[in-house]
């Protein structure tokens, strides 16, 4: 079976996606560690962290909406 025309390996778009997710997740993980150090292992830590995630997602939604970008998962 000829492999001409097939690309092997990982595409540049996939690498870019994983690097972007890493850049987003590392600060969030550090935030959680700092909250856990400051508040201890309590529900306050989880509540503050969850609130930050909701605010970030809402900000992303409003930004994408202002640029005219639609979220595809809302149509399902």
Curated annotation (Swiss-Prot):
Keyword presence, Membrane: yes
This protein's UniProt keywords: Membrane, Transmembrane, Transmembrane helix
Transmembrane segments: 19-39, 43-63
Compartment list: Membrane
Result of knocking out the encoding gene: Deletion mutant together with deletion of toxin Tse5 leads to a significant loss of fitness advantage when placed in competition with parental strains.
Topology within the bilayer: Multi-pass membrane protein
One GO cellular component term: membrane
Described function: Immunity protein that plays a role in preventing early activation of toxin Tse5.
Protein name: Immune protein Tsi5
Gene expressing this chain: tsi5
